Each structure stands twice: as C-alpha cells, then as structure tokens.
C-alpha cells in the first residue's frame, strides 16, 4: 500500500492543497486512497472529503494513546490502496508549541510513515537547503523521505530540484505552480503537475 504523511516547516505552506492534489492524483490512478489528518482539526478533513467523497479520519496523539492511533489508522486504511495523512502546523510543532508531542513528526514516528515535506521556495534557493537540513536533522529518525515544492514556477523547479537533491540527498518529487487565483483552480489542474 502507498502510505505517507505530508508535513511542512510551518502553517500556510500548502499542505492541504498538496494533500488534496495527491489524493485526486491517486484516485485517478485507481489507488482508492483514504485520508487522515493529524490532530482534532475538522476543516481540512472536509476538503479531503470533497476530493474523495469518503470520510477523512483524525489521528490525535493528545487525545489517544499511540496504540489506539495505530489501530485507528490500520482500520481506516484497510481495503484502500493508498493512505495519505496530512500533518498540522509545522512538522515538529506539538503541545503548547514547545514540544514535539502530538506533532506531525510524532504521528509519523508512531505510525512509521515516510514524510513528504511541502515547502514554498519563496525568496530562497540555497538557504532553503539549509532550512531543510535543520528539519531533517532535528530528530532521529526524521522520517523525511522527499520534498514537494509549492507555489513554484516550472523554471524555479528546474533550478532548485537538482540543487536540493544534491544538498539534501532527498528526491524532489514534484511541484505545484502558483495559481493565478485559488478560486479558479480546479483539482485536475492542480494534480496534473504531480
């Protein structure tokens, strides 16, 4: 089964947009994906439902023990060809903003999921590699397995991808372009670049 968690250095990086694009791409490829959201957020799961037409489940390590979260994940993913988890806030941001407990990293660690890091390369190039190196090396294991660029032009992707792969030793798996207007963006236009 295809399974991964999408995370980002901070809120507002495009995790939900990227999650919905990947869910749609997996659905179109016949993978029968299911969706999960870390924490108690009910808004992002509504977007997942709109894309998939199925329920999106919350996995919360504050309200539930790790064993319970593992069971909920296994039951929710059963019968699906792909399971996509969307992290909340910044990758390591957990309880009170000063702990990694109940963070996206904690969820990836609990479930043993690879992490795809969604980053916006706005106003950065090589400095982005330094920032990402910090995220990769902050906890061991970080579970970070790949990078997705958001709000990125094709030209910037061609420039950044080889540099990031060289500096990070991680693949840049794709990008989403900066849309003219999110209100005019259709799901098939978003997922076409992945």
Model-identified regions with their sequence ranges:
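N-terminal low-complexity segments that are often proline-rich with Ser/Thr-Pro
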Residues: 192-194
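ATP-dependent carboxylate-amine ligase catalytic core
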Residues: 2-17, 23-111, 119-146, 155-159
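Beta-strand-loop-alpha "switch" segments that mediate conformational coupling across diverse proteins
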Residues: 169-182
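Short hydrophobic alpha-helical runs that function as membrane-insertion/retention elements
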Residues: 115-118, 173-175
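Conserved small/polar residues in nucleotide/adenosyl-binding loops
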Residues: 183-190
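Short, structured patches in soluble enzyme cores that scaffold and shape functional sites
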Residues: 148-152, 176-177
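GTPase G-domain guanine-specificity segment
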Residues: 151-168
């Amino acid at each position: 089964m295809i399974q991964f968690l999408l995370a980002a250095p901070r809120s507002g990086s495009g995790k939900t947009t990227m999650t919905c694009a990947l869910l749609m791409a997996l659905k179109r490829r016949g993978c029968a994906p299911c969706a999960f959201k870390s924490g108690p957020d009910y808004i992002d799961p509504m977007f997942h439902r709109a894309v998939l037409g199925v329920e999106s489940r919350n996995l919360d390590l504050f309200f539930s023990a790790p064993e319970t979260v593992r069971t909920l994940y296994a039951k929710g993913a059963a019968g699906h060809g792909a399971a996509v988890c969307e992290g909340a806030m910044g990758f390591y941001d957990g309880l009170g903003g000063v702990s990694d407990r109940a963070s996206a990293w904690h969820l990836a660690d609990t479930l043993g999921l690879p992490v795809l890091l969604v980053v916006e390369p706005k106003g950065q190039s090589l400095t982005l590699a330094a920032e990402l190196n910090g995220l990769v090396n902050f906890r061991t294991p970080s579970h970070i397995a790949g990078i997705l660029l958001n709000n990125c032009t094709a030209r910037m992707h061609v420039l950044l991808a080889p540099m990031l792969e060289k500096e990070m030793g991680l693949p840049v798996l794709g990008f989403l372009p900066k849309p003219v207007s999110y209100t005019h963006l259709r799901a098939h236009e978003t997922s076409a670049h992945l």
